[in-house]
């Protein structure tokens, strides 16, 4: 069974970049070689701040989307600092599921 990761990088300009992968070491090396995402190419070097593991690609991609679109920078930094990314993501999914149940 594959393992999937949502990861957060800090770029040289102190901005954050979030992505997903199956191989953290390889992906970090790819980013730092300038062959990663367009966003990180001009912000090298990057360093890994946090990663969260998942059993399936969909959860890793959903966590990436949630981190990018549902949180502001202050929230992101707090979750990273307190190692709460996965816990808060699961809470978000549970709340979302409850809302969907009540809407039906």
UniProtKB/Swiss-Prot annotation:
Residues 2-79 form the GIY-YIG domain. The lineage of its organism: Bacteria, Bacillati, Bacillota, Bacilli, Lactobacillales. This is UPF0213 protein YsiG. It comes from the Bacteria. Belongs to the UPF0213 family. Pfam families: GIY-YIG (PF01541). CDD domains: GIY-YIG_UPF0213. InterPro entries: GIY-YIG_endonuc, GIY-YIG_endonuc_sf, UPF0213_domain. PROSITE patterns: GIY_YIG (PS50164).
């Amino acid at each position: 069974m594959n393992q999937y990761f949502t990861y957060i990088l800090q770029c040289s300009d102190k901005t954050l970049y979030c992505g997903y992968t199956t191989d953290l070491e390889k992906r970090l090396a790819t980013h730092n070689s300038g062959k990663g995402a367009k966003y990180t190419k001009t912000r090298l070097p990057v360093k890994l701040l946090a990663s969260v593991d998942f059993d399936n690609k969909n959860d890793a991609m959903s966590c990436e989307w949630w981190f990018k679109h549902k949180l502001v920078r202050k929230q992101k930094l707090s979750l990273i600092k307190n190692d709460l990314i996965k816990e808060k993501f699961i809470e978000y999914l549970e709340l979302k599921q409850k809302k969907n149940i009540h809407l039906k």
